Amino acid sequence: MAEERIVPMRLQRFLARAGVASRRGSERLMTSGRVTVNGQVVTELGSKVDPLVDVVAVDGIVCSIAEKPVYLMLNKPAGYLTTMKDPQGRPTIVDMVPTDRYPGLFPVGRLDMDTTGLLFFTTDGQMAQELLHPSKHVWKHYVAHVVGTPTEEQLNRLREGIELEEGPAAPAEVEIVSNDAKMKALLAPQGLGKTGGGEPNSLVSVTIREGRKHQVKKMLLAIHHRVLALHRDTFGPLHLTGVKEGEWRLLTEEEVAALERTIGREPGASPIMPLHASK
């Protein structure tokens, strides 16, 4: 029986299947001149590629369609941008994850440059879109090292949904954890919980289901407590365990199944369709 030929596909479909972005997002990447095929910039949306022959890259990073999606977590240290490429040459998270081994790997959501902790990566574009969609209400847990100690009245403002410049934040789960010895021991490697400059400070646990830019910092500043350091240790069902700062690990089957349940996908169902032509 003759081997089946892999079907050439539209470039934006290839990018979506490689987990780079959604189909529409892939089109924007193309029209902005960030996509190359065999070293040549391609902006025409009708362009096709052969996954077995053509070399496709976005911002210089080669993309490919993996047989199975890849899922991993990084324990991000401070001082790295959550981007795959920085025009100014600053350190980025791409320096710490195996993009050469897993082409198409990208972060789901962002952490500020000075924020540490759990950052989830995948080649599964569909899962990424679902997890970031507001309707999924994916909870994220942070511990903030802040100047001063918020009062119960101030914490209640966060629990009720505090007004920010860009609109009200959804209600958050917050509590003071400064006296939690286990929490302080856990955060010691990140430098959280240490006093400095003679200023009184505290550790505040913050759990939110939104993902606005600088959201936790803005929320705490709105109650007059500046964030000195911020660390994230959960993202949905994922917990930052077994990963030293600056290192990564692949997710377990149980963790992937938990993510699939979070987005309403049957555990074990692969979003990657076969590349071979079907009759």
Locations of the language-model features?
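Basic, flexible Lys/Arg- and Gly-enriched helix-loop patches that mediate nucleic-acid binding at interfaces
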Residues: 2-279
